[in-house]
Amino acid sequence: LIDESSTTNLMNFTVLNTPLLEFYPSEFDSANVALNKEYKEKSFEIYKNLLKDRSEITTNAEIFDAAILSAYRTYVGAMKNELKQNLYNTLQNPTEENIAASKQMSEQFLDSLHLLKKRFVKAWDMESRSYYRNVFTERYDKIAKDVLDAGNKVFIQTTDNRQQTTVSLKTIFNDRPIYYTVDGSEPDKNSMVYTEPFAIERSCVVKAACYGD
């Protein structure tokens, strides 16, 4: 764990702030998956041990509280990596089992993120700061929104074949209509509904969108 002296540093955490739905296959090789799993397990073990020690001490409580927050934040960061891996796998192979697992993992992550936010706000207030708290709490809210909106994200994939390009549109959970346009305009519920991959033979701008219930 890194010794972090203020709550400001505790939210400047790269893993939590990286985009959830920007997928790069190299992130999901077996070595990275295994390393993140170990990272998650060890950070949670440290977190539990710190909680136990915190309940037994009578001095230096603020130091333990900062360490607990840091350990839990590290754990939640590893949870986000795991969720991202799972969402990517579901996008590539949208079976009922994978979709159900991704939705369950999303709920678990949101619960943990909510607890992390509460711990962060408590630590911030303990420092008696009256400024910028909303700036950092909004980052937590954005992370949660990205998870909640994951099902509406449309992934546009293209395959070049001779003189034409085939366009495929996908969502992670494959459970709602996809609306699209090929003239660069923003799609709405009156736009074309995607049913199967389609070919384009000239330069155009494809835009697609889903709309939640």
Question: How would you name each of these model-derived features?
Answer:
Residues 143-213:
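Short, compositionally stereotyped local motifs that mark structural "simplifiers"
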Residues 1-154, 158, 177:
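Substrate-binding groove of N-acetylhexosamine-processing glycoside hydrolases
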